[in-house]
Design a protein with these regions (language model features):
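Catalytic-core region of carbohydrate-active enzymes that cleave or remodel glycosidic bonds
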Residues: 59-61, 79-170
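Aromatic- and carboxylate-lined catalytic core of secreted/periplasmic carbohydrate-active enzymes
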Residues: 123-126, 135-282, 293-314
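Short, solvent-exposed loop/turn segments in extracellular or other extracytoplasmic domains
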Residues: 286-291
Length: 314
């Protein structure tokens, strides 16, 4: 029955520029199942067969993936059947930021190499948390570590909950939250993640390299626990001699840009991920040691620092 359904979908929509997602929550058993391990194994085998079938019958070779309960590669027996990997880091607020960082790092470096998308993490407002600050952390930590895209979600939208007909309780007996979709669509994280997408597309993002060796930042009082070094530590990417981008999840102390090429002149600016505004800094004045510490922006929260070579900028 599932193959027949997919055969219909391919025949009906295959000529359009579509992407095939085999299913949602690939190998996650039903909430109340008493045979969870056996169910997951059967689902993994079944979706592998269906994915191979769709690939064999689609004459347009549309991209194929699967929405996972954790990692896309774990949902099928042969990950090479997928064109890109979806991830899900769950909805544990700050805890899922750390999980997403771990998942993205592993997936981007895995074989076979394929594009990676953080497909579901921390729907805004779910369980009364995961608000806009967490949305920004999830987005920038993912794209700065090599993902090819990012999905934003909001509680209330995924259920299409309304005032007249709230979604209510899931089969496990609990409600994820009852904000109606009309309100959820206006949550600030949506706009701020959208601003992040506009920001990343300013640059040839597919050419960016991870460069942790270009930034030095010491922990300060805003880092409460040892694990905060992962969540609140800076992430740097760039293109040698052309571009440096640093995401600083908490700018109390701005950190120092290091290993600046002595024969390259840079100009710099701050990007505010809350408002989308640029704050010009001007020419980068490099020390004899090849280092530069930027001036603080006006308000302490997360910021992005951009250094562009004057030759590239012109």
């Amino acid at each position: 029955a599932v193959k027949r359904y997919w055969r219909y979908l391919v025949a009906r929509y295959g000529a359009y520029p579509v992407v095939w997602c085999m299913c949602g929550e690939g190998i996650m058993p039903y909430y109340l199942s008493e045979t969870r391990e056996a169910d997951a194994a059967q689902q993994k085998s079944g979706w592998t067969e269906v994915m191979a079938y769709v690939r064999s019958i689609d004459p347009y070779a549309n991209l194929i993936s699967i929405h996972p309960n954790l990692k896309g590669r774990q949902q099928v027996e042969d990950p090479s059947l997928m064109d890109f990997e979806m991830l899900q880091a769950a909805h544990r607020d700050i805890g899922s930021v750390a999980r997403s960082i771990e998942q993205v790092t592993e997936a981007v470096g895995a074989e076979p190499v394929m594009p990676v998308i953080e497909a579901e993490v921390n729907f805004e407002g779910i369980l009364g948390r995961s608000w806009q600050n967490v949305q920004r952390l999830n987005f920038y930590h993912a794209v700065m570590r090599g993902t090819a895209g990012h999905n934003y979600g909001a509680n209330g939208i995924w259920q299409m909950s309304t005032v007249e007909e709230p979604y209510g309780r899931s089969p496990h007996g609990r409600s994820w939250g009852e904000i109606p979709w009309q309100e959820a669509a206006q949550l600030p994280g949506s706009r701020q993640v959208g601003l992040g997408g506009q920001f990343i597309r300013r640059f040839p993002w597919w050419e960016l390299e991870p460069r942790p060796d270009w930034i030095r930042c010491e922990p300060d009082w805003t880092w409460d626990w040892p694990a905060d070094v992962v969540i609140y530590g800076p992430v740097c990417v760039g293109i040698p001699r052309q571009l440096r981008i640093v995401y600083m999840p908490m700018v109390w102390t701005p950190g120092t840009i290091v290993a600046i090429e002595p024969d390259v002149s840079y100009t710099a600016y701050w990007f505010d991920p809350c408002t989308g505004k640029d704050i010009d800094i001007g020419p980068v004045e490099v020390s004899d040691a090849g280092e530069w510490t930027p001036p603080l922006p006006g308000e302490c929260h997360d910021w992005l620092l951009v250094l562009t070579s004057t030759e590239t900028a012109s």
